[in-house]
A protein has these predicted regions:
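Helix-coil boundary and interhelical linker segments in multi-pass alpha-helical membrane proteins
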Residues: 698-706, 772-794
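Generic alpha-helical transmembrane segments
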Residues: 717, 794-811
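ATP/pyrophosphate-binding catalytic subdomain of soluble kinases
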Residues: 762, 766, 805-808
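A C-terminal functional module that forms or caps the active site or interfaces directly
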Residues: 814
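Transmembrane alpha-helix/helix-exit interface in multi-pass inner-membrane proteins
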Residues: 267, 763-775
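Conserved cytosolic headpiece of P-type ATPases
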Residues: 1-739, 746-747, 760, 800, ...
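Membrane-water interface at loop-to-transmembrane-helix junctions
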Residues: 742-761, 789-798
Length: 893
C-alpha cells in the first residue's frame, strides 16, 4: 500500500474504510481496538515479584537484622543453649518487612496508574457522526480527529483539513520551528523514493504539538505502529523522583547509621575493657554477648518503619487530594503546596464559572446581521439535541445569543471558505463565509480596542458610513461603560468580497473594516471563590489575578472577590512592557490584577514574585502558558479547559478548574507535612529513648533489652499509631498560620529539641520501671547483682511493658506538637483503633506463655508490677502537657 503522505486524502480515507463526515461507528472502533490494542507505547517489563522481594533484603537495616539473627543463633550454640526463638522472630520480621515493602511498591504503582488515568490525555473524535471526547488510548486507525492549538497529537495521522494549523515536531525531528500543515499530496523529489519525516507536511505525528490554528485528520497509526513507537522501541521505566522530604529522610538515615556505628564501636570497646581483653578473646560467649549489645543498640537507633510510614502518608494524601479534585502529578508538589505564599490565578473558569452569557449589545449593524456575524466568527457549534452551543465558553455565549433569536442553521447556510484563527498576540480572529447571494463576507471578532482601531467605516442601520473620530470615541466610551459593569466585551467588524480572497492571512484580512457592534457578556464569579480567597488571606497566601480581559472588567471582578480595593492596584500588559525587570521586581507586590496580559508576560510575573523570595503557584490552560507554569514553584494545569501540553508540565491538575480547589490543596499540603513531622517526632523520640536506655544500661553493666524486643516496639507498637497520626485531621489553626519557610528543615521549630527531650522523658520512665521491677523481684536494688546477671527478668518485662504503653499513650500527645491533648475537639478513629491493636498485641506477647517465654524467659509479672508499669507509662501525658505549655510560652516570646 502506498504511503499515506504520497496518497490523496480521499484515497487514505478509502483505505481506512471511513467516511470523513461520519467517522467510525462505535462497534467498528471496538473491533479495531481489539485487533490493534490500546494507543500506547509499550512500557518496560515490570520487575518480577521474587526479584523485588530480594531487593528489599539489600536494605542496610534488613542486613543488620539478619546479622543480629546469626549472632543470636551463634550465641545460643556456643553457650550450649540452642534456642532459636529469637532467630525465628527476627527472620519473621525480615520476611514480613520485605513482603510489606513489595506490597507498598505495588500499591504505589497502582495509585500512580490510577492518577495517570484520571489525568489521561483526551482526544476529540468523530464517532457515528458525533464529535465526542475519548481517552487517546482508545483511538484506532481510521478515527477522524479534530486538532486545535494546545493539543498533543495523539497518534500518527494524515491531515484532511488545515486552517493554518502549525505543529511543533521537535520531539521527532529536532526542528523547533513549527511546521504549517496542509492536506495536499506530497510529491517525491526526482531520484528519491521517500520523503524525509520533517517534510511530510500533510502528516502529523504522535508526540508533536499543535501550536497554532486547527485541523482535521484521520488516524493511520497507533501505539507502537507510530514514528514515536519506532524510535522508542520500549519506554525505559521512569523512576519517580524523590521528594525533598524523602531526600532529607534518607540523609537522616545516613546520619543515624554513622552515629550507630560510632556508638556501637564505643560500647563494644567499653564492654571489652570491662570484661578484660584477654577474657573476651578466650571466651567466645563474652564476645558474642558484646556483639549482641552492639546489635541491640543499632536496632534501637534506626526507626525501621519511618521511610515506609512517610511514603504511605504521602500516598494517602495524594489520593485524598485527588478526591478533592486536585490531581498531583509530582509528589514533591505535596510539600511545596504547604509553603505557597502567592497564587497567580487565571480569571476565566478558575475564579469564575466559565459559563458566559451575553447580557448587553451596542449595535451599529442590524441586529440579525450582528448576531449572525458573531456566531459565524466562532468555532462553537449549535447542538440541536442539547438545544445549546458546545465549544469554548465565550464562543458558546455568542452562538447561544444567535440561537435565542432563531439563528441556528448558520454554518450550513454560510460555509466557511477561509480564516485567520485567533491568537493571543492579535487578540482576534477572522473568518470568510459564503453569503446566500453568492458573495463572500468577512467577519472579524476580538478585543474592542483592537477591532475598533482597524475600522474605517461603521454601519448606521443598513448603510455603511465613514467612522469619524467623534463616533470612534463614542464606541471606546461604550466599551468602557460595559467593561465597568464587569462585562467581557467583544467587538465585531465585517468586510465584503465578490470572490474568495486569495490570501487569508491576518495581514491580508484585518484592515479597512466596517464596525458592526459590541457584545457584553458576563462570566459569573464562582460562589465559593470569595470565601476561598478570604481563607487564603488568613493563611498568609496572597491571590493575584492574571487575565487577558480589559483592565476595567478585571478590576470589577477583583473588587468583588476582595483581591484589590481600587484600580491603582491593577496593571496592564502594555505597562509591563514599559517596565524593566528591575522595576517590576521592585513593585510587583503593589499589584493584585494583571490585565490584558499575554502568555510571555506571565513568566515575567512569576519571576518577579520569585525575586521577592515568594513560593509561587501559577495556573494556566493554554499551550503558551506552559513556560510560566513550568517556571512556577507549583504549576497548576486545568483539567477541563487545559491543553495536553499544559497538563503535562503541571505539578498539579485541577479536575474541576476551580480556584477553591487550589486553597483546599494548600490546606491538604500543610496537613500532610504537619502530620509527617508528627510521625517523625513520634518515632524518633521512641528510638532515642531506646538508644539512651540501652546505652545507659550497657555503661552500668546490665542488659535491658534484646534486639527482638526492640523490633517489636519499633515495628508493631510504633508503626500502627504512626500511620494513624499520618491520617490526623488538620489542626484548627492550620489555615491561620503563615506559610512555612521552604528552606526550613524537617527539625525546624524546635522539633530536634522536642525529640531529644521527649526521648529523655521516656528513658527516665523506662529505666525507673526497670528498677521498680528489680525491687519488686528482689526487695532491694543492688547494681552488683544486676551486673552479674541475677534477677533482672522481671525488671526487663516491666521496662518492656512501660516502653510499649508509653508509646501507646504518647501517640495521643502527638496529635498536636503544641496544643493540649485536652483541647483537641475532633477524634481520630484510626488512632484509637491502632492504639487498641498495639495494646492487644502487647498483652498477648506478655501474657501468652509461649510468647512470653520466647521474649522474656521464664518470668511471670505480678499484678502490682503491671499496675506500676501502667502508672509510670501514663506519666507521659501530664509530663508532655507541662512540656507543651513551656514550649508554647517560649515560642510566644
Amino acid at each position: 500500500m502506498q504511503k499515506e503522505y504520497l496518497s490523496a486524502a480521499a484515497e487514505v480515507l478509502s483505505d481506512q474504510g471511513v467516511d470523513e463526515n461520519l467517522g467510525l461507528s462505535n462497534d467498528e472502533a471496538s473491533s479495531r481496538l481489539a485487533k490493534t490494542g490500546p494507543n500506547k507505547l509499550e512500557e518496560a517489563e515490570k520487575t518480577p515479584l521474587w526479584k523485588r522481594f530480594f531487593e528489599q533484603m539489600a536494605d542496610p537495616m534488613v542486613i543488620m537484622l539478619i546479622v543480629a539473627a546469626v549472632i543470636s543463633a551463634l550465641t545460643g550454640m556456643v553457650k550450649g543453649e540452642p534456642d532459636f526463638a529469637d532467630v525465628a522472630i527476627i527472620m519473621f520480621v525480615v520476611i514480613v518487612n520485605s513482603v510489606l515493602g513489595v506490597v507498598q511498591e505495588a500499591k504505589s504503582e497502582e495509585a500512580l496508574e490510577a492518577l495517570q488515568e484520571m489525568s489521561a490525555a483526551q482526544s476529540k473524535v468523530l464517532r457515528d457522526g458525533k464529535l465526542v471526547h475519548l481517552p487517546s488510548a482508545e483511538l484506532v486507525p481510521g478515527d477522524v480527529i479534530m486538532l486545535e492549538a494546545g493539543d498533543s497529537v495523539p497518534a500518527d495521522c494524515r491531515v484532511l483539513e488545515s486552517a493554518t494549523m502549525k505543529i511543533e515536531e521537535a520531539a521527532l525531528t529536532g526542528e523547533s520551528v513549527p511546521v504549517e500543515k496542509h492536506a495536499n499530496v506530497i510529491e517525491l523529489a526526482a531520484g528519491t523514493d521517500d520523503v524525509p519525516l520533517g517534510d511530510r507536511k500533510n502528516m502529523c505525528y504522535m508526540g508533536s504539538t499543535v501550536v497554532y490554528g486547527r485541523g482535521r485528520a484521520v488516524v493511520v497509526g497507533t501505539g507502537m505502529n507510530t514514528e514515536m513507537g519506532k524510535i522508542a522501541g520500549a519506554l525505559a521505566e521512569a523512576k519517580e523522583e524523590l521528594t525533598p522530604l524523602q531526600v532529607k529522610l534518607a540523609e537522616l538515615s545516613r546520619i543515624l547509621t554513622i552515629m550507630v556505628i560510632v556508638i556501637c564501636v564505643v560500647i563494644f570497646g567499653v564492654d571489652i575493657i570491662r570484661h578484660g581483653v584477654g577474657n573476651v578473646l578466650t571466651d567466645p560467649t563474652a564476645l558474642l554477648d558484646t556483639f549482641m549489645v552492639a546489635v541491640s543498640l543499632a536496632v534501637a537507633a534506626i526507626p525501621e518503619g519511618l521511610v515506609a510510614v512517610v511514603t504511605i502518608v504521602l500516598s494517602l494524601g495524594v489520593t485524598k487530594m485527588a478526591k478533592r479534585q486536585a490531581i498531583i502529578r509530582k509528589l514533591s508538589a505535596v510539600e511545596t503546596l504547604g509553603c505557597t505564599q502567592t497564587i497567580c490565578s487565571d480569571k476565566t473558569g478558575t475564579l469564575t464559572q466559565n459559563k458566559m452569557t451575553v447580557v448587553k449589545h451596542e449595535l451599529a449593524a442590524p441586529k440579525e446581521k450582528f448576531l449572525a456575524g458573531m456566531a459565524l466568527c466562532s468555532d462553537a457549534q449549535w447542538d440541536e439535541e442539547l438545544g445549546e452551543a458546545v465549544g469554548e465558553p465565550t464562543e458558546c455565549a455568542l452562538v447561544n445569543d444567535a440561537g435565542k433569536a432563531g439563528l441556528t442553521g448558520l454554518t450550513a447556510e454560510h460555509p466557511r471558505v477561509g480564516e485567520a484563527p485567533f491568537d493571543s498576540g492579535r487578540k482576534m480572529m477572522s473568518v470568510v463565509v459564503e453569503t446566500l447571494d453568492g458573495e463572500y463576507e468577512q467577519y472579524t471578532k476580538g478585543a474592542p480596542d483592537v477591532v475598533i482601531g482597524l475600522c474605517t467605516h461603521i454601519y448606521e442601520g443598513d448603510k455603511v458610513v465613514p467612522l469619524t473620530e467623534e463616533r470612534r470615541a463614542e464606541l471606546v466610551a461604550a466599551n468602557k461603560a460595559m467593561a465597568d459593569e464587569a462585562l467581557r466585551v467583544l467587538a465585531l467588524a465585517s468586510r465584503t468580497y465578490t470572490e474568495v480572497p486569495a490570501d487569508c492571512s491576518p495581514a491580508a484580512l484585518e484592515h479597512d473594516l466596517v464596525f458592526c457592534g459590541l457584545s457584553g457578556m458576563i462570566d459569573p464569579v464562582r460562589p465559593e471563590v470569595a470565601d476561598a480567597i478570604h481563607e487564603a488571606h488568613d493563611a498568609g497566601i496572597r491571590t493575584v489575578m492574571i487575565t487577558g480581559d480589559h483592565i476595567d472588567t478585571a478590576v470589577a471582578i477583583a473588587k468583588q472577590l476582595g483581591i484589590v480595593t481600587d484600580r491603582s492596584q491593577a496593571i496592564t500588559g502594555a505597562d509591563l512592557d514599559r517596565m524593566s525587570d528591575e522595576e517590576l521586581d521592585a513593585h510587583i507586590e503593589d499589584y493584585g490584577v494583571y490585565a490584558r496580559v499575554q502568555p510571555e508576560h506571565k513568566t515575567r510575573i512569576v519571576e518577579a514574585w520569585k525575586s521577592r523570595d515568594q513560593i509561587v503557584a501559577m495556573t494556566g490552560d493554554g499551550v503558551n502558558d506552559a513556560p510560566s507554569i513550568k517556571r512556577a514553584d507549583i504549576g497548576v494545569g486545568m483539567g477541563i479547559t487545559g491543553t495536553d501540553v499544559t497538563k503535562n508540565v503541571a505539578d498539579m491538575v485541577l479536575a474541576d478548574d476551580n480556584f477553591a480547589t487550589i486553597i483546599g490543596a494548600c490546606e491538604e499540603g500543610r496537613r500532610i507535612y504537619d502530620n509527617i513531622r508528627k510521625v517523625i517526632q513520634f518515632l524518633l523520640s521512641a528510638n532515642l529513648a531506646e538508644v539512651f536506655s540501652v546505652f545507659i544500661a550497657t555503661l552500668i553493666g546490665f542488659t535491658i533489652f534484646q534486639p527482638v524486643q526492640l523490633l517489636w516496639v519499633n515495628l508493631v507498637t510504633d508503626c500502627f499509631p504512626a500511620l494513624a497520626l499520618g491520617m490526623e485531621d488538620a489542626e484548627g489553626d492550620i489555615m491561620k498560620r503563615k506559610p512555612r519557610n521552604a528552606k526550613d528543615g524537617v527539625f525546624a521549630g524546635h522539633m530536634g529539641l522536642d525529640c531529644v527531650v521527649q526521648g529523655l522523658i521516656i528513658t527516665v520512665l523506662v529505666l525507673a520501671s526497670f528498677f521498680v521491677g528489680v525491687y519488686f523481684d528482689m526487695g532491694y536494688i543492688h547494681i552488683a547483682d544486676m551486673i552479674a546477671g541475677n534477677a533482672d527478668e522481671e525488671g526487663v518485662m516491666m521496662a518492656f511493658i512501660t516502653l510499649n504503653m508509653v508509646e501507646i499513650f504518647h501517640c495521643f500527645n502527638m496529635r498536636s506538637r503544641r496544643a493540649s491533648l485536652f483541647t483537641m475537639k475532633k477524634q481520630n478513629k484510626w488512632l484509637w483503633a491502632s492504639a487498641a491493636l498495639a495494646l492487644v498485641l502487647t498483652v498477648i506477647v506478655t501474657v501468652q506463655p509461649t510468647l512470653a517465654e520466647m521474649f522474656f524467659g521464664p518470668v511471670t509479672l505480678e499484678l502490682k508490677g503491671v499496675l506500676a508499669a501502667l502508672g509510670l507509662a501514663f506519666l507521659i501525658i501530664p509530663l508532655m502537657e507541662i512540656y507543651k505549655a513551656i514550649m508554647r510560652a517560649v515560642e510566644k516570646e
